[in-house]
């Protein structure tokens, strides 16, 4: 993550989407939230933010995916990011943002968080506000749990709400094939379904961890750069509730594994399904097979860098 020391007239910043290769959800807290422990991997689907000076704050969208249902008002996460940076630095002036989106919307891959991360970095450069890495990460955490990771990128362990990051070593490149649903799944609904499941089956299952942790096998597989090892330990506590709310995802998981995927996992709260392939050739074959089944499919690799300035 880098920023310029002097202001510019226009800035282009880019931030990646993510896959949660492991996600363990702790018990429901009194404040209504859950602590989590997750292994994030940034993947090669990007949000490109073009920032230009303006008197006010505005945003428009383009890109490879349908953005018609996105809000362009003040509650948009990118607008909130720009306003937060301006407020925290005392900057007077606004910004117009043009965001080219390639990360699926409401797909559990952190597209909105990537928008916010790239906006923070773009506006910091545009305005010459010279925030440090730690300052940008802290601002990101105010905006959402996944925003700090979109700034940092690579592979990392997230704890707390997912915003307390520690880097994790990942060797080599992992090949992912992503099946994109034509619908979104509400993150609060998925967490709510998880809580209801745990309450219904409290006598039959182990209680949720108060302080969740990422399994050591996940860290070992990432360090080894071994997709076969990683396939054995992919884990998501939100997968079962997501499948309950969207049963068709189970058929997608089965289809991918029948066509050569080492394993499949619902990414985050879904509904994107991420399939891990053994190598590039296997990923291409899987992409063709899933496309033939009339699924919307994207191939991506990870890990990749976090938010960075492209021009400006």
Curated annotation (Swiss-Prot):
* Gene Ontology BP terms: isopentenyl diphosphate biosynthetic process, methylerythritol 4-phosphate pathway; terpenoid biosynthetic process
List, from the UniProt record, the residues annotated as the active site of this protein: 18, 146
Q: Which residues bind ATP?
A: 104-114
State the InterPro entries in the record.
GHMP_kinase_C_dom, GHMP_kinase_C_sf, GHMP_kinase_N_dom, IspE, Ribosomal_Su5_D2-typ_SF, Ribsml_uS5_D2-typ_fold_subgr
What is an example of a GO molecular function annotated in this UniProt entry? 4-(cytidine 5'-diphospho)-2-C-methyl-D-erythritol kinase activity
Q: Does the keyword ATP-binding apply?
A: yes
UniProt entry keywords in alphabetical sequence: ATP-binding, Isoprene biosynthesis, Kinase, Nucleotide-binding, Transferase
| Cleaved signal peptide residues | none
Q: Does the keyword ATP-binding apply?
A: yes
Q: Which reaction does it catalyse?
A: 4-CDP-2-C-methyl-D-erythritol + ATP = 4-CDP-2-C-methyl-D-erythritol 2-phosphate + ADP + H(+)
Pathway terms, separated by semicolons: Isoprenoid biosynthesis; isopentenyl diphosphate biosynthesis via DXP pathway; isopentenyl diphosphate from 1-deoxy-D-xylulose 5-phosphate: step 3/6
What is the E.C. number? 2.7.1.148
- Report the domain of life of the source organism: Bacteria
The record, for Pfam families, names:
GHMP_kinases_C (PF08544), GHMP_kinases_N (PF00288)
Q: Which Gene3D superfamilies match?
A: 3.30.230.10, GHMP kinase, C-terminal domain
PANTHER family annotated for this entry? 4-DIPHOSPHOCYTIDYL-2-C-METHYL-D-ERYTHRITOL KINASE, CHLOROPLASTIC (PTHR43527:SF2)
Question: What does this protein's UniProt record list under function?
Answer: Catalyzes the phosphorylation of the position 2 hydroxy group of 4-diphosphocytidyl-2C-methyl-D-erythritol.
What NCBIfam families is this protein classified in?
Answer: ispE, PRK03188.1
Which family does the entry's similarity section mention?
Belongs to the GHMP kinase family. IspE subfamily.
Listed name of the protein: 4-diphosphocytidyl-2-C-methyl-D-erythritol kinase
Q: Which organism is it from?
A: Clavibacter sepedonicus (Clavibacter michiganensis subsp. sepedonicus)
């Amino acid at each position: 993550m880098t920023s310029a020391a002097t202001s510019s007239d226009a800035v282009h910043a880019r931030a990646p989407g993510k896959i949660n290769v492991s996600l363990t959800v702790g018990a429901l807290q009194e404040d209504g939230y859950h602590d989590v422990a997750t292994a994030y991997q940034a993947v090669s689907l990007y949000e490109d933010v073009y920032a230009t000076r303006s008197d006010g704050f505005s945003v428009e969208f383009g890109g490879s995916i349908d953005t018609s249902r996105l809000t362009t008002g003040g509650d948009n996460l990118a607008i909130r990011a720009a306003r937060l940076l301006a407020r925290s630095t005392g900057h007077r002036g606004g910004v117009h943002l043009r965001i080219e989106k390639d990360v699926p919307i409401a797909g559990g891959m952190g597209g909105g968080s990537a928008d916010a991360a790239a906006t923070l970095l773009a506006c910091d450069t545009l305005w010459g506000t010279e925030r440090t890495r730690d300052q940008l990460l802290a601002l990101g955490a105010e905006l959402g749990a996944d925003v700090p990771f979109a700034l940092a990128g690579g592979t990392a362990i997230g704890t707390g709400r997912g915003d307390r990051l520690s880097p994790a070593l990942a060797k080599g490149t992992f090949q992912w094939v992503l099946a994109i649903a034509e619908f979104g799944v509400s993150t609060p609904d998925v967490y709510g379904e998880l809580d209801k499941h745990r309450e219904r089956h409290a006598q039959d299952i182990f209680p949720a961890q108060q302080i969740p942790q990422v399994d050591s096998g996940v860290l070992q597989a990432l360090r080894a750069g071994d997709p076969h090892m990683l396939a054995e330990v992919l884990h998501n506590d939100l997968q079962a509730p997501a499948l309950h709310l969207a049963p068709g995802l189970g058929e997608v998981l089965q289809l991918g594994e029948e066509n050569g995927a080492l394993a499949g996992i619902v990414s985050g709260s879904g509904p994107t399904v991420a399939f891990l392939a053994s190598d590039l050739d296997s990923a291409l074959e899987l992409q063709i097979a899933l496309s033939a089944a009339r699924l919307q499919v994207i191939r991506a690799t990870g890990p990749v860098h976090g938010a960075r300035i492209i021009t400006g």
